[in-house]
């Protein structure tokens, strides 16, 4: 609206500016030239700090250019239109990948379009403002010349034109960079548009205050026309002109009423200004003037004070928040007083001032917030939202206001998509970091300054200046992390404050009605928050985080703006929503009402409130728990179990039930948010909600959400999602569910990311998509899917409309399914994804809900896809990511649920998918149902395969995903990552790392999460054998998924995996810890990877892989290594956990499914063991497995390996045909089962996969080959029993079978008499992602060598292991198989993975799955590696590879397991590459599997 109006007008002026500086000479700063330089630099900055400040940079740059425009990035984009936007698009490309290409692209496209339209239209529109135009043209020439001339000057940085450009260019690197740092992670780019839009709005209010300063500045820069010769003063004075102001000034100048725009502005304070001016001008003027004197960041901090006045109005509303307001002002002011704060915060550095200058140049000032606001994003965004409304309402004509409102809504949508994830992240980050931190986070360094200097309030808010920096770093690394940290602390607080401030600020400019509305909203939010808090879904923070992380991603934007919650939640909502600051509320809103609002009209709105809270809470909880996705997973799982117990989300259950609307909405909203996040991330990131997400999933979980994710989110989702979160939510599978579910579903973050994250949130999107598609899954898919997947999902959702059908169920329905699946949980959603719910519920729900899931399966294919990329992880989960994510979240966004979702969801989802797949694949649909629960469980894997099968779908989606993945390997990693979302967030890395971890995370996390929940939930769930299977799996998956969620967190997942692995119980803690540690790098890499990955993937991915491997893998390795022992001890613990689960599972599910699944699930849990075993893949796994074996291990192994295990391993290759088939199947199936389950379980699958395929299975198999095999066979048999012999090839794995059966795969993989599927490389490679595959293949080659040495190492380990356990030998055989496999190729080096792949086709199936995973992205790499190895070993490499591509798809789709497996494989390889231990440790899950297997 205003933004648009501004945008439109500005673009107009800007456009004119392009020709000539518009009267808005301050805007003049935006001359194309500066903009361009800015953009180029921006590009540079952005590219350079894609992860970093790309977002901010872009925003700032874009904003700068656009700043002129409206200071709305979007506007800028519009203004810059093609130019900025294109550059922005580049940034966007980078960023979009980060921010969620879809959303941003969407944003970009939308914004660009709108802006272009605004620009063009705007010009025409503005034509209505001919005087402005004329003036703009008149002034433009002057200003422009001035700017240009000044710009020609060495970028005084003072000049509006030049300053922002140069300074912003420079500063953007610094400030923008900083901001960007926060932003990119935050998806500020998108935030930018929204934020910018908001900022303009903010600026509207800010303009008043800032106008004071601006006038001062203008005097300083009068000659410069904002040229701001006193470069610093302009820097110091950030004149934020609303479009209205700028236009008015221009008009006045044209009319001769004013000498200059500056004079006019100085003389005339807009209403907002007057509202604020009294508050601001006094301070602002003096301050700004002083500031000029201060002329330094101090000066800008003073501007901050003006912004406080700007918020001044807000202060009254927000007096307590006065400091917060100051902070808000720091935050908002960055946003609102963007000029000031922008100047202050932004101007903290002269560069920031440049930002401020840019802001100045952005007379609309909307941009300043955007520029600093980028950082402000969180701040500005919230503020922006409020201010946006504020501004939006401020001086525009009714028409413009309406337009602006629409634009705002659009922006808000985008914001929510992008910003939601970005915003929340920024919010979490920036706001958490501090408002200044928001910007400052970007400018952490500067933020440090501004916070100190500017921070009267800023500091207060910035209690976290360091955090700001951290935020920045994390922002960089993984916003999910940051925002979680800051977000949590400040998220709620600040969020509220910010929100309130925003609202209040917004109120400044807002009309009384709006103010009233806002107030109501605030009250509503607060009430909701209280409710939520009461709901205790776990503090809104997690939601915030989740939302922030995943939620961010999966903000409610889609619903809100789609549904018009925006209308309902007008700016307030936007603001509030947008203010992830008030993440809880806003977030809630955003996720909840907004989310639900539109998405679940009314209902959700209503519910969301509760669920908003719930959503928020859960999300937050997960965030909390997910705090790292891991914990959230646990938290949720724990909580869930407690809460949901069986339902897994009591709340959810209740809510879900209550609302399955709610829960599901909850979930959905959350998931959606996560998704969004993933989308954003990826992503996250995925198009989070298909609608928005899909569309908006520009973000995309990421974690590209994710993890935009990715991530964040990181999930997710970070984002699982965390993500994905990103995490996060993802990680908190519960949250994860959000993230995991959302991101997780998306956690991504994980998202995947996370939200998958982002596959870009494909994961999340995937999840989202899934969640959307399945609503559950679709949502997740969407979240995970984000852009690609979003698209895919869209297609799939739409295309697989059937999925959509089922998935299309409605988001609600899907969500419901998801909810049911999630049964309990959001986590459920994640978990829903979780086989648990998913399988169980999912299976039932999805199985029954298979509709949904059938769709899911198909969708799952998507989901896998979605997950695959993002939610591959998420699912990885199906929601493979997150953030992480998201769900994305890798399992986080990975499966954002992604991760968790992915895993959870992925698992669940995927299992669902798988189940469906399997069901579909069907082998015994019912059996599958039940078994498929297993199947589903492995289904996830299988699903992956199935999904793979779905592959048709998946392939289609997946392929796209893969395609995305091919690019996607790059992207896929991203997507995968994103998809992993969570994984994505760690996406690539996560995917690599997190995915590895994440997937493993899911496994591990599953272990942890599930492990804990597993036992609890698992037991909980397990009791329901079905559910057990499913549930257990779900649990495991949940665990896995939650891990995914962690995966969403990506980093966390990896850590989590370690942790998870490390402590099934501890997982969360450990994971979280590792996650955090991992997160920064992991997330950062993930996010970077996620964002940058597409192009960088190979290099970056490899680097990430390396880093991930080194870092995460090693890291997990360490944890894992310790865990291994623990797994041995703990393994038992884990094993217990897992075994527990395993036992539970095994016991409950011991039967083929329960046990297998559970076994797998336990495996999943055990994957921690397995994972641990990873580290101790042999040892832990063995012992663990033995434990598991004896206990659940048997089952587990049995399940895992049993089918593939001893048999396969034993007769790794012998049985491969039959037992191995089964085994293979188990490996594969198991992989599908174990793998799938693992995959589904994410880690579990992976682990299971690994165990299944590897030690565990062997061991288990040996121990329980009969039982397990039967069970597994049962499981497998379910999928594989029949298939065992022949079925094996076909039923080799449900997943593999699916894969084999997969229409696409069928061509590629053809059952052989031996039961070893042969992969027709010619088909496959060309098939899904030849390049990706190839790429990875080479990667693989690189790693394979590495891998092989590690492999050798592994072999040694395995040998040791083999020697260790006679029983193990089989297991080892798996491992031994590796050895043997290696030696005996047939055995499946990674029984599943490599060898399995190589040795055992089933394993290949698995491997494909694994490869798939590997193939997916990192997985792919691994896959490739595996394949490579396989190829080498088996010569199946190609085939395997082939399958992997296929499987990849599916497996990618497979998410965790695949990713895990892939990761496992990839990681294994990678990890192997990195280190056996690492691989074992990190990859162990994936690596473990592959590793061990290898």
Swiss-Prot record:
Biased composition annotated in UniProt, kind: Pro residues: 20-37, 279-289, 299-322, 1119-1129, 1165-1176
Disulfide bond sites: none
Record's protein name: B-cell CLL/lymphoma 9-like protein
Keyword annotations: Acetylation, Activator, Isopeptide bond, Methylation, Nucleus, Phosphoprotein, Transcription, Transcription regulation, Ubl conjugation
Post-translational modification Phosphothreonine, affected residues: 511
Composition bias type Low complexity, residue spans: 348-360, 1046-1059
Cross-link named Glycyl lysine isopeptide (Lys-Gly) (interchain with G-Cter in SUMO2), sites: 1339
Predominant subcellular localization, coarse grouping: nucleus
This protein's record includes keyword Ion transport: no
BP GO annotations: canonical Wnt signaling pathway; myoblast differentiation; negative regulation of transforming growth factor beta receptor signaling pathway; positive regulation of epithelial to mesenchymal transition; positive regulation of transcription by RNA polymerase II; regulation of cell morphogenesis; skeletal muscle cell differentiation; somatic stem cell population maintenance
Gene: Bcl9l
Residues with the Asymmetric dimethylarginine modification: 677
Region listing for Disordered, in residue ranges: 1-236, 269-496, 905-1082, 1113-1206
UniProt modified residues of type N6-acetyllysine: 36, 108, 110, 137
Classification of source organism: Eukaryota, Metazoa, Chordata, Craniata, Vertebrata
Keyword rRNA processing: no
